[in-house]
């Protein structure tokens, strides 16, 4: 999926942090106090805050212009050194000031257990001169960017004045403006395209509970009223919910993963959404891909990035092999993904007991009508009800395997009812194909497909080909 994306340029502005990890082994308790003694064996420094958003976007292949504020101190030097590892990140927009202390979070860890975190931050109000320099650097970057990200850690860089100026610049350029928020309310983000609070941030800013899907949608609508844009609520194990003014809500289930550390997961989400939008994809597609990126991020320890290769492999896990037999629920998610990428989905159904040239011809003709072909097979019980107790000749697993092996078939599902009506309603195919021995008014699901703009296609059959005829021939053949 993402292998074909051509990522664009992203401006990231916000609070720059340095994340440090002091690691070591613990084998005893201090005699001085009831605390573990850590035998130091390493120090790792990684970009944090807005800088982590930048490296996550760069890891996917985007060009990034990073704008922010650091002090003239050792932490600033370490942060800039870590950013040199990412040649696609432009750091000329980082402003240095002797009046600012580079925000540093130092974690002491043993194994994958965090023992203590030590923060260094002395937050002072920004002078008008510093604010103006930040705006100038941001506007210079926005002029050549495809997406603007404001990473607000509430550390003082994104003042009301800075936000107003850069959001206005993004809107004037006509590019998406994404805000990762930390404020108690979202009025300061007026004009943003998308704000991405987590569940706790959304509850605090709205004053409403956000436990169920319905509650989250109400929260998102309330938050949108504060700034006027769309809202993406990240919900940990409950996935993500996208609320938009001009589209239906989108709930994306979380992907199963072993959670080691949630540090920086929100940065990964906003970076992925920004990168996918910079490639010209839809917001819905960006959210689905960001859900996969988040699952990878929390499976890593500490502030981490997700590479394009890792994300591509993760996304492919959701997509089965061509012709695979999958549950209808999974098929619905796959078809939805195909639709988001502009594919026309074709649907046909049948018992397909003993596959013969007539079946192959029908499926080849069906596949030519669109981009993806889903075949729904009657289960064994369904076939017996329709054809009699001696059928099917082949069990459903065997029939599914044979049909799925045909080059023209992309996906196979089973249905236990006498007709595939419910499957059609669930999958919402664009084109419904049956043999020309039917008339359109006889095709089950024709009215459903046509109700949302789809069509029904009747294809010519190969004369003299019939499973029933084959079965009779086998029964009458001399033993």
UniProtKB/Swiss-Prot annotation:
<keyword id="KW-0511">Multifunctional enzyme</keyword>
<dbReference type="GO" id="GO:0016773">
    <property type="term" value="F:phosphotransferase activity, alcohol group as acceptor"/>
</dbReference>
<keyword id="KW-0067">ATP-binding</keyword>
<keyword id="KW-0808">Transferase</keyword>
<dbReference type="GO" id="GO:0033786">
    <property type="term" value="F:heptose-1-phosphate adenylyltransferase activity"/>
</dbReference>
<feature type="binding site">
    <location>
        <begin position="198"/>
        <end position="201"/>
    </location>
    <ligand>
        <name>ATP</name>
    </ligand>
</feature>
<dbReference type="InterPro" id="IPR011913">
    <property type="entry name" value="RfaE_dom_I"/>
</dbReference>
<dbReference type="GO" id="GO:0033785">
    <property type="term" value="F:heptose 7-phosphate kinase activity"/>
</dbReference>
<comment type="pathway">
    <text>Nucleotide-sugar biosynthesis; ADP-L-glycero-beta-D-manno-heptose biosynthesis; ADP-L-glycero-beta-D-manno-heptose from D-glycero-beta-D-manno-heptose 7-phosphate: step 1/4.</text>
</comment>
<dbReference type="GO" id="GO:0097171">
    <property type="term" value="P:ADP-L-glycero-beta-D-manno-heptose biosynthetic process"/>
</dbReference>
<dbReference type="InterPro" id="IPR011611">
    <property type="entry name" value="PfkB_dom"/>
</dbReference>
<comment type="subunit">
    <text>Homodimer.</text>
</comment>
<feature type="active site">
    <location>
        <position position="267"/>
    </location>
</feature>
<comment type="pathway">
    <text>Nucleotide-sugar biosynthesis; ADP-L-glycero-beta-D-manno-heptose biosynthesis; ADP-L-glycero-beta-D-manno-heptose from D-glycero-beta-D-manno-heptose 7-phosphate: step 3/4.</text>
</comment>
<keyword id="KW-0119">Carbohydrate metabolism</keyword>
<feature type="region of interest" description="Ribokinase">
    <location>
        <begin position="1"/>
        <end position="322"/>
    </location>
</feature>
<comment type="function">
    <text>Catalyzes the ADP transfer from ATP to D-glycero-beta-D-manno-heptose 1-phosphate, yielding ADP-D-glycero-beta-D-manno-heptose.</text>
</comment>
<comment type="similarity">
    <text>In the C-terminal section; belongs to the cytidylyltransferase family.</text>
</comment>
<keyword id="KW-0547">Nucleotide-binding</keyword>
<dbReference type="InterPro" id="IPR029056">
    <property type="entry name" value="Ribokinase-like"/>
</dbReference>
<dbReference type="GO" id="GO:0005829">
    <property type="term" value="C:cytosol"/>
</dbReference>
<comment type="similarity">
    <text>In the N-terminal section; belongs to the carbohydrate kinase PfkB family.</text>
</comment>
<dbReference type="InterPro" id="IPR014729">
    <property type="entry name" value="Rossmann-like_a/b/a_fold"/>
</dbReference>
<dbReference type="Pfam" id="PF01467">
    <property type="entry name" value="CTP_transf_like"/>
</dbReference>
<dbReference type="GO" id="GO:0005524">
    <property type="term" value="F:ATP binding"/>
</dbReference>
<protein>
    <recommendedName>
        <fullName>Bifunctional protein HldE</fullName>
        <ecNumber>2.7.1.167</ecNumber>
        <ecNumber>2.7.7.70</ecNumber>
    </recommendedName>
</protein>
<dbReference type="InterPro" id="IPR023030">
    <property type="entry name" value="Bifunc_HldE"/>
</dbReference>
<feature type="region of interest" description="Cytidylyltransferase">
    <location>
        <begin position="347"/>
        <end position="479"/>
    </location>
</feature>
<keyword id="KW-0418">Kinase</keyword>
<keyword id="KW-0548">Nucleotidyltransferase</keyword>
<dbReference type="Pfam" id="PF00294">
    <property type="entry name" value="PfkB"/>
</dbReference>
<dbReference type="InterPro" id="IPR004821">
    <property type="entry name" value="Cyt_trans-like"/>
</dbReference>
<dbReference type="InterPro" id="IPR011914">
    <property type="entry name" value="RfaE_dom_II"/>
</dbReference>
């Amino acid at each position: 999926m993402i292998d074909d994306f051509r990522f664009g340029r992203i401006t990231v502005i916000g609070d720059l942090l340095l994340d440090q990890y002091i690691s070591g082994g613990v084998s005893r308790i201090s005699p001085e106090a009831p605390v573990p003694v850590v035998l130091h064996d390493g120090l790792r420094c990684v970009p944090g805050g807005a800088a982590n958003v930048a490296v996550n976007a760069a890891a996917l292949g985007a060009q990034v212009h990073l704008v922010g504020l650091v002090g003239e101190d050792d932490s600033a030097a370490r942060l800039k050194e870590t950013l040199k590892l990412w040649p696609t990140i432009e750091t000329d927009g980082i402003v240095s000031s002797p009046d600012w202390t580079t925000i540093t979070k130092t974690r002491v860890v043993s194994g994958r257990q965090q023992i203590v975190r030590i923060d260094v931050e002395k937050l002072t109000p920004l002078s008008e001169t510093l604010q103006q320099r930040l705006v100038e650097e941001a506007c210079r970057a926005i002029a050549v960017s495809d997406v603007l990200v404001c990473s607000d850690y509430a550390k003082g860089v994104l003042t009301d004045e800075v936000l107003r100026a850069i959001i206005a610049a993004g809107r004037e350029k006509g590019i998406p403006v994404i805000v990762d928020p930390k404020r108690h309310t979202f009025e300061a983000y007026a004009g943003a395209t998308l704000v991405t609070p987590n569940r706790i941030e959304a509850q605090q800013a709205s004053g409403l509970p956000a436990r169920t899907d319905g509650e989250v949608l109400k929260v998102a609508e309330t938050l949108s009223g504060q700034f006027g844009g769309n809202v993406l609520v990240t919900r940990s194990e409950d996935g993500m919910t996208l609320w938009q003014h001009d589209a239906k809500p989108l709930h994306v289930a979380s992907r199963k993963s072993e959670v080691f550390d949630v540090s920086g997961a929100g940065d990964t989400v906003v970076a992925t959404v920004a990168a996918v939008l910079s490639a010209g994809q839809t917001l819905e597609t960006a959210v689905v891909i960001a859900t996969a990126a988040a699952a990878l991020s929390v499976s890593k320890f500490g502030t981490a990035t997700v590479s394009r290769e890792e994300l591509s492999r993760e996304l492919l896990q959701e997509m089965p092999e061509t012709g695979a037999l999958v549950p209808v629920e999974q098929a619905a998610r796959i078809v939805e993904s195909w639709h988001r990428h502009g594919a026309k989905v074709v649907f046909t159904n049948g018992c397909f007991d003993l596959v013969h040239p007539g079946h192959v011809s029908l499926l080849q003709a069906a596949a030519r009508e669109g981009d993806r072909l889903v075949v729904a097979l009657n289960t064994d019980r369904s076939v017996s009800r329709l054809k009699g107790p001696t059928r099917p000749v082949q069990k459903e697993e065997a029939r599914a395997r044979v049909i799925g092996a045909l080059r023209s078939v992309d996906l196979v599902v089973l249905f236990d009812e006498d007709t595939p009506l419910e499957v059609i309603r669930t999958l919402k195919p664009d084109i419904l194909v049956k043999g020309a021995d039917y008339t359109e008014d006889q095709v089950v699901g024709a009215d459903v497909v046509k109700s949302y703009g789809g069509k029904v296609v009747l294809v010519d059959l190969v004369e003299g080909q019939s499973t029933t005829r084959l079965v009779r021939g086998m029964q009458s053949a001399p033993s």
